[in-house]
């Protein structure tokens, strides 16, 4: 480990204004301190417009400045920390649509689609070294952009029963647009290592009173292990699918609430790698017991359906 520390402070102020019933505007200003260094003032502007009350169709957009100090792990982790890292900074633009509809006591349906575009200087990324461990470094210029889509459907087919479905998909190219570090550098114009371009997930949850059964499926597209994006045996990691299931039970007592959870991870014993030469576990089992004390009196009994 390492014996390092620093004081971190942050402050945020925002102003919100609705000139009309349908239009909303917001400006936020943030500033942070890490150790003895302050970030510049970090502004953000947000707007939303209610296109239609039917279905609660809303258009949203924002522009924000990005500024990120390296974490203590980035700087000092052993082995691999890099105390010479620069700070990330840049701008992000996004826009999207969202909707929400439903019928009380029967179902709710929500969804959103967002386009984003980020231009980041000195992007911090951890990459493998010739010594066998990872170390962070700065990528001079990165253009990260893409589309994110999310949807949620909750159905109550009968009393005490609830079916909850969540789905998401992301297309997120992250391209190195910096300068060549040497004449042989082939990383410019290529996807960043270990960043999948496509990912998706689907979660289904069936709840009955204090019981819940959950199935989660996830997909990650191929990832390159080298900045040159070479299609060699060790130059990329293949796509993989993952399935997990779990059964939960909530118990309620006067002094505490107890959550019991039994999970089967990697249900179909998928062979996959998140990092080159480091195989991930096959099918494995997990038992979780969570205890939440109750402080005060007259606590309402409720079923916590969050994982």
Enumerate the predicted regions with their spans.
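Structural signature of Gram-negative outer-membrane beta-barrels, strongest in the C-terminal barrel
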Residues: 2-118
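Residues that define the transmembrane beta-barrel architecture of outer-membrane proteins
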Residues: 3-9, 39-41, 89-93, 141-147, ...
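Transmembrane beta-strands of outer-membrane beta-barrel pores
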Residues: 7-9, 29-35, 63-69, 76-78, ...
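Gram-negative outer-membrane beta-barrel transporters
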Residues: 18-22, 115-119, 138-225, 257, ...
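Transmembrane beta-strands of outer-membrane beta-barrel proteins
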Residues: 25-27, 43, 57-61, 93, ...
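Membrane-embedded beta-barrel scaffold of Gram-negative outer-membrane proteins
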Residues: 50-52, 58-60, 87-145, 150-160, ...
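C-terminal beta-signal and adjacent terminal beta-strands/loops
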Residues: 219-228, 238, 244-307
């Amino acid at each position: 480990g390492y014996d390092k520390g620093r004081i971190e402070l942050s402050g945020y102020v925002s102003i919100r204004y609705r000139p009309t019933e349908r239009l909303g505007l917001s400006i936020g200003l943030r500033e942070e301190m890490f150790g003895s260094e302050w970030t510049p003032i970090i502004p953000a502007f947000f707007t939303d417009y209610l296109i239609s009350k039917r279905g609660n169709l809303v258009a949203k957009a924002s522009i924000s400045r990005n500024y990120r100090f390296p974490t203590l792990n980035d700087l000092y982790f052993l082995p691999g920390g890099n105390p010479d890292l620069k700070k990330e900074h840049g701008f992000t633009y996004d826009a999207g649509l969202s909707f929400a509809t439903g019928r009380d006591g029967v179902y709710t349906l929500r969804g959103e689609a967002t386009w984003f575009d980020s231009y980041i200087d000195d992007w911090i990324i951890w990459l493998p070294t010739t010594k066998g461990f990872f170390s962070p470094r700065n990528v001079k210029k990165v253009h990260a952009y893409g589309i994110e889509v999310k949807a949620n459907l909750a159905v109550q087919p009968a009393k005490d029963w609830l079916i909850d479905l969540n789905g998401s998909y992301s297309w997120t190219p992250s391209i190195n647009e910096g300068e060549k570090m040497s004449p042989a550098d082939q990383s410019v114009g290529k996807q960043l290592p270990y960043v999948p371009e496509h990912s998706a997930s689907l979660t289904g949850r069936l709840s009955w009173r204090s019981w819940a059964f959950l199935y989660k499926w996830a997909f990650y597209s191929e990832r390159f292990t080298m900045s040159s994006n070479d299609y060699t045996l060790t130059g990329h990691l293949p796509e993989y699918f993952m399935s997990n299931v779990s059964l939960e039970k909530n118990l309620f007592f006067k002094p505490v609430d107890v959550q019991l959870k039994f999970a089967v991870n990697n249900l179909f014993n998928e062979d996959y790698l998140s990092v080159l030469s480091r195989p991930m576990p096959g099918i494995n089992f997990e038992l979780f017991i969570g205890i939440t004390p109750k402080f005060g009196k007259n606590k309402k009994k409720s079923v916590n359906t969050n994982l």
